[in-house]
Design a protein with these regions (language model features):
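Glycine-rich beta-to-alpha transition loops that act as phosphate-gripper elements at the mouths
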Residues: 51, 74-76, 126-132
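C-terminal active-site rim and adjoining tail of enzyme catalytic domains
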Residues: 2-6, 81-168
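Short gly/pro/ser/thr-enriched loop/turn and capping motifs at secondary-structure boundaries
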Residues: 55-58, 77-80, 153-155
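Metal-dependent phosphodiesterase/phospholipase catalytic core, i.e.
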Residues: 1-69, 88-120
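Short hydrophobic/aromatic-enriched beta-strand-loop microsegments
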Residues: 45-50, 66-76, 145-149, 162-168
Length: 168
């Protein structure tokens, strides 16, 4: 209802020192302040940064190298998809692919995509999954993470599968 204040990033990481964060800097002007905050709060072991902009992803890769969990940009995701069809595409910097199940009519996440990603030690996080049947299907494929707008449903799916601990 808009009555609670939106927390500042600095307050969030201070209030929840053990929380892992997935961060998508949505605008170019957010990159440098985020780089500064990651350094100030020593967050490299707690965050994964990914973006829909190859330029933003590259900026974080250049700044932190392999010390930062880096999500793949759109071009790298496309190369990983091609790699799942056994096409030679070179190496990857991103340590996780954060992707939709499909892009338009083009499927992205399938058993070949997940298998190739895992063969390359790349985690697969899929968004935005809100239906329990689809959650189960993706977990059966072996995806490493699901992003949802319905966390209570995701928790229920995890509980059904014995994947939810009392600590959350």
């Amino acid at each position: 209802d808009g009555v609670e204040p939106i927390p500042r990033f600095d307050d969030l990481v201070t209030a929840f020192p053990d929380m892992r964060l997935n961060i998508d800097p949505k605008a170019d002007n957010s990159v440098e302040p985020l780089i500064a905050a990651l350094r100030t709060h020593h967050l490299l072991d707690r965050v994964c940064v990914g973006a829909f902009s190859d330029a933003r992803v590259t900026r974080f890769a250049d700044e932190f190298g392999p010390d930062l969990c880096l999500g793949m940009g759109p071009r790298e995701v496309a190369r990983l998809r091609l790699s799942s069809w056994r096409l030679p595409v070179g190496s990857f910097r991103g340590r996780c692919a954060q992707v939709p199940v499909r892009r338009g009519r083009v499927p992205i996440v399938d058993n070949r995509f997940v298998a190739m990603a895992h063969q390359l030690d790349i985690a697969v996080h899929v968004w935005t999954i809100d239906e329990p049947d689809e959650m189960h299907d993706l977990l059966d494929l072996g995806v490493d993470g699901l992003m949802t707008d319905r966390p209570a449903i995701l928790r229920s799916v995890f509980e059904e599968r014995g994947l939810w601990s009392a600590g959350g």
